[in-house]
């Protein structure tokens, strides 16, 4: 994966950095649980990929068993590249690495939103426990420090459809709204300004079919007590200054944040709660048991009664959930700051982040320093999780610039100041899951965020803390607890499925 491009799309050539590679070829089963409601077949890229995988490879799977042996042929590399995103300019100072063998109650693997929030909540609930966070690079190096900065509620799914249990959908919405308020309070308590603004989020609608679906969706959502609004085109244009969309629906409870500054909030909160954080500490091996044994590349061992997997897209490469998660490359770029006069000419009057209704979604945000960032579009998947390349990255950033100019023609000629990419974890049906795995049920996890991670990660951090404390009753009603995720085939069928699905959507997206 190449990231951190200093961009001029008209001049200059981006550079890519080398990274160390580790591998772990174990595979571990996990318990079955409640299944999230699937999204409609016509609208889900993930379902298309899954069906392509079975159609293209199913006969061969049974005939030659390649799907079973391919993990031993193609090891997925565990690549930790430096985070050179715009957000990374605000990365908090790093802690020293682990320098000796230790024994702990809970070891948290990964220093992003999931890991740091889990450490904070575990210590808050169980202050007698020794909790350590082990981060391979610096906190926020992964998806937590590279994302699109939108803080989203869970309003059913982003294709504007409720499940067969809309009352549960409303409870999930309320849970994510409450968490946004908790994040705001936590930021205030630490004294760190993470640029948290809860002035709502917009989904802008691309087609007339999207408009019809959204009107029905908003009507049902409001009947359940969700305060979402349908915005006709004039109101939409007044807010964000573009006429390219048909309409939109607005959620007043969403918002945006500076992701790396939010990482800093969680790092300080976890530290203040008594958690220990070790950075530049890579775990290369995990031995299961009633007491787990973790091995670092520095030669140290960690004995732990419980483990939290907070490794997002890298989770399969640690030997867990190999057939549940795709590590997908997402691309983001940011402009130089605009003056107030320039923003007035562009017409973006309200500082509301928005994303469109396409499957290969684009999303945009207006920062406090008047920069505009745009991300999304065609994601990337490379064979066996390998790194991307300069030509591929440049083509994605060019796509982002074309889309930015399409939305705001006045931005023609504006060059991105910086572009970056990073891998995020996607499940095939965009369903998240939180729970426990392993033979001794002492390995906790949260994954499959599929674009909702800025908010949902710390919801799952709270749930993990409750599970560790044996307090799972309040979460049993939620479909994401121990949810079994749709099957992802091994290579080469994974790559075949991903390329077929992505190519199909590039041809059919409006």
Task: Enumerate the predicted regions with their spans.
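Rossmann-like flavin
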Residues: 165-269
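N-terminal Rossmann-like FAD-binding beta1-loop-alpha1 element of flavoenzymes
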Residues: 106-132
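Glycine-rich FAD pyrophosphate-binding loop
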Residues: 125-146
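Extreme N-terminal leader/targeting segments of oxidoreductases
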Residues: 34-106, 124-125
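Glycine-rich active-site loop/strand segments that organize a redox cofactor
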Residues: 146-174
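C-terminal catalytic lobe of FAD-dependent flavoproteins
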Residues: 382-390, 402-499
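Helical element adjacent to the flavin cofactor pocket in flavoenzyme catalytic cores
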Residues: 248-291, 296-298
């Amino acid at each position: 994966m190449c990231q951190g491009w200093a961009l001029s799309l008209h001049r200059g050539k981006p550079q890519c950095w080398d990274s160390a590679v580790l591998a772990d070829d174990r595979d571990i089963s996990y318990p079955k649980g409640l299944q999230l409601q699937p999204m409609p077949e016509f609208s889900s890229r993930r379902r298309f990929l899954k069906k392509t995988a079975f159609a293209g490879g199913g006969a061969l799977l049974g005939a030659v068993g390649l799907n079973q042996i391919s993990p031993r042929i193609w090891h997925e590399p565990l690549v930790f590249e430096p985070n050179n995103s715009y957000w990374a300019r605000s990365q908090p100072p790093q802690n020293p690495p682990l320098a000796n063998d230790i024994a702990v109650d809970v070891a948290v693997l990964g220093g992003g939103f999931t890991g740091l929030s889990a450490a904070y909540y575990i210590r808050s609930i169980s202050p007698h426990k020794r909790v350590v966070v082990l981060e391979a690079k610096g906190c926020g190096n992964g998806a937590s420090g590279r994302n699109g900065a939108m803080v989203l509620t869970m309003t059913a799914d982003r294709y504007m459809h409720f499940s067969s249990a809309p009352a549960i959908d409303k409870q999930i919405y309320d849970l994510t709204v409450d968490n946004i308020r908790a994040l705001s309070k936590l930021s205030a308590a630490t004294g760190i300004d993470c640029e948290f603004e809860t002035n709502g989020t917009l989904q802008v609608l691309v087609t007339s079919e999207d408009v019809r679906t959204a009107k029905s969706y908003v009507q049902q959502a409001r009947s359940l007590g969700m305060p979402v609004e349908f915005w006709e085109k004039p109101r939409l244009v007044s807010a964000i200054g573009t006429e390219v969309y048909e309409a939109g629906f607005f959620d007043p409870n969403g918002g945006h944040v500076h992701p790396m500054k939010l990482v800093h909030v969680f790092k300080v909160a976890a530290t203040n709660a008594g958690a220990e954080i070790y950075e530049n500490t890579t775990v290369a091996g995990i031995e299961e048991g009633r007491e787990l044994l973790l091995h670092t590349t520095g030669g140290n061992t960690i004995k732990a009664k419980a483990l939290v997997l907070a490794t997002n897209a890298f989770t399969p490469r640690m030997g867990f959930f190999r057939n549940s998660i795709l590590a997908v490359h997402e691309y983001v770029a940011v402009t130089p700051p605009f003056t107030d006069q320039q923003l007035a000419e562009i017409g973006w009057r309200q500082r509301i982040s928005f994303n469109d209704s396409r499957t290969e979604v684009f999303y945009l945000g207006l920062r406090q320093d008047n920069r505009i960032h745009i991300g999304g579009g065609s994601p990337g998947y490379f064979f066996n999780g390998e790194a991307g390349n300069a030509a591929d990255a440049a083509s994605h950033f060019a796509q982002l610039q074309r889309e930015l100019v399409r939305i705001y023609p006045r931005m023609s000629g504006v060059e991105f100041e910086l572009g970056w990419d990073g891998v995020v974890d996607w499940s095939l049906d965009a369903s998240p899951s939180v729970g426990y795995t392993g033979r001794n049920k002492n390995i906790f996890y949260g994954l499959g965020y599929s674009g909702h991670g800025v908010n949902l990660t710390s919801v799952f951090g709270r749930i993990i803390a409750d599970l560790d404390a044996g307090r799972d009753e309040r979460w049993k009603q939620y479909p994401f607890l121990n949810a079994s995720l749709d099957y992802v085939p091994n290579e080469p069928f994974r790559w075949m499925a991903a390329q077929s699905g992505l190519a199909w959507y590039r041809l059919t997206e409006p």
